[in-house]
Amino acid sequence: MTASVARFIESFIPENYNLFLDINRSEKTFTGNVAITGEALDNHISLHQKDLTISSVLLDNESLNFQMDDANEAFHIELPETGVLTLVIEFSGRITDNMTGIYPSYYTHNGEKKEIISTQFESHFAREAFPSVDEPEAKATFDFSLKFDAEEGDIALSNMPEINSHLREETGVWTFETTPRMSTYLLAFGFGALQGKTAKTQNGTEVGVFATVAQAENSVDFALDIAVRVIDFYEDYFQVKYPIPLSYHLALPDFSAGAMENWGLVTYREVYLLVDENSSAASRQQVALVVAHELAHQWFGNLVTMKWWDDLWLNESFANMMEYVSVDAIEPSWNIFEDFQTTGVPHALQRDATDGVQSVHMEVNHPDEINTLFDSAIVYAKGSRLMHMLRRWLGDEAFAKGLKAYFEKHQYNNTIGRDLWNALSDASGKDVSSFMDTWLEQPGYPVVSAEVVDDTLILSQKQFFIGEHEDKGRLWEIPLNTNWKGLPDTLSEERIEIPNYNQLVAENNGALRLNTANTAHYITDYQGQLLDQLLEEFANLDTVSKLQILQERRLLAESGRISYESLFALLDLVEKEESFLIAQAKSQILAGLKRFIDEDTEAEVHYKALVRRQFQNDFERLGFDAKDGESDEDEMVRQTALSYLIQADYQPAVLAAASVFQAHKENIESIPASVRGLVLINQMKQENSLTLVEDYVNAYVTTNDSNFRRQLTQAVSYLKNQEGLDYVLGQLKDKHVVKPQDLYLWYMNFLSKSFAQETFWNWAKDNWDWIKAALGGDMSFDSFVNIPAGIFKTQERLDQYIAFFEPQTSDKALERNILMGIKTIAARVDLIEKEKAEVESALKDY
């Protein structure tokens, strides 16, 4: 673990930054000055800076001595006095393409390459733009002004509204209102040839969505509508008004993360903000969720901020939960919680079952560790699920009441996790800390075994693992959330015995179910008659319960607690189901079964027959083309079904896709987005030519539609000729073709295809130093460790993975993922070796 970093706020407490930046876009340089008013507690203080040149430090117009400390991203100042004072600092720096600090985004408009300038200061990159106490606890107000080499039509945006626009016309300086007290990582700005639209919330907050001029004017409309309605919802739910005058949202062509919650100027990847009339239902829902997530942060993270990065998980877990709560409230017909059940839940359960996984709450000694510890499956998905679990345990009324008290007490200040637990405890009368500690401080989750022995119902808990592990006897405070009366509310000990099972049966209706609604973070292993009764009633269960059974039995099969072959009986039960939830659950089981299958074998023929049988009913019901007035759910079921049917060479789907391609071959971007990716994949599978590869790559370069680019990436990966692979490899290092932020998508798609796997695995190893240099500061860098761990399934690949990555475990940013990757592949290899023959035999007889 990295040594603890010094906290500069302990010697200097800033209150206000009066910051001016003069940016030379063409030269990629900037100069600036900042007057920092604050209280010095010592004669020797330190400020953060990274890659800045500090020209002077003045106090009352007198120069002060200072010492640069680049190794610690700091400089140290000698003061003649302590107390409240104002330091005036002159500095300069360079703009780089690292997507941190101040950086450019590149795009093409009318054939001309253009750029906009924007910022990314979370977690500790404000120091790349100006001297500061760059720590979340060091909240201050900001008076920000900006000058740049403007071109006609350029506009600038920041956290607050512009003031003195008449002076800008004379001086070229953009000046913005004073911000509220906030952390340095939330300051933001962007400028260039931008366009946008605005609207007002019920309480008068101005909401705006902006993008480059290369985007369609109406591409901002959907997000604007969502943002307005979500702010209205949050103000009502939290009973705390949105705290600042504006809420702007800016889509950036180059962006390391998915989005960033800068107060008043949220920044996004284009794919997570922009929607047009051809966008799919899934894309629209994803945009709505991301916008709602970032807006939740305006209260939880911005208005009230964690004291140190240890509690950053709470910001993200809370926002991840609230995105679903808010979107469900404004668009109930979407049934958006189903999206979480099919994405976040299985992601968390799979990752959290590997020995060595982190706990949700982790000590952070240095900001450099944040990306190391920021496992999205744990911090976002598991953390969100724990917040859903807590909300259900408390009840929504007490939960909302506690949040209101929390915001009112701590607004514009910093907190630790206990402060939220105290507010929720006061509102509910329950001991929240005691309930949550076992879930937050321990890695993993339990499996609850349920069985009947001699008229006694036995419930026991044990940590659930997939693969090699060390059992440390961990126990959890498990909310049973059962559909039966007469059972305890929680299971906190290792085992409980509940007598008179037959009497319980007589007093209750239906088979016993635990964790109803699937909100708590555990799975259940029903045994014997309990499983038999559950499966007998399967057809009458609600859709979430059906999904839950499929997910849990699949995980039990992954762990070896039950056979993979036993899952075929479950597929029989859901063959005719029509919901998106079940389509996704089926697809997860089918994806698991596919790992047992080698290409061009008899087993593959039988596997494809199984796939066709599972999804043929959906195709016959829905067809290939969208119907007027059909539901979003039907559209998404069609997408899932077609994706499997085309892989399984189902001829009606293959021929329909080919027909659509021919009708749009002069402009493939015009193919309806909901089936466009599948049409492109089908054409590559059928044609498999270098010419088509080149056409797809050319379309990738020229389009401004991020969703279309992702579809093209996936489609190109289905090529099966070495000439085409060599052509693609030649494009990967050209940032004008493949943006560094998207490189992992190309790698993932090609590595998952057997024909391309060897070529791309060797490419990654041979070019590792370049990948690290290009992406070392990017949040997608560890994907290059995790992606092969999620794909490889042979002993040969495991040996290669170990040989390449094990020597790199000295890199703390990679160590945990490497060690977990080894265990993940080893578990898969072991499972396939043990059950391959049984699965192939079952496929043959199916």
Regions found by a protein language model. Name each.
Residues 112, 200-204, 266-267, 354-361, ...:
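Short alpha-helical hairpin
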Residues 176, 209-470, 592, 599-621, ...:
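Hydrophobic alpha-helical and helix-loop surface patches within well-folded domains
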Residues 1-245, 360, 366, 375-381, ...:
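Acidic/His-enriched low-complexity segments
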Residues 82, 139-140, 151, 170, ...:
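Short, well-ordered loop/turn elements at secondary-structure boundaries
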Residues 99, 155-157, 184-186, 276, ...:
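Short helix/loop capping segments that flank catalytic or ligand/cofactor-binding pockets
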Residues 147, 211, 296, 363-367, ...:
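Non-catalytic accessory/interaction domains
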Residues 49, 291, 716:
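Small/polar loops that bind or transfer phosphate-bearing groups
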Residues 26-28, 136, 257-259, 704-705:
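Short glycine/serine/proline-enriched coil/turn segments at secondary-structure junctions
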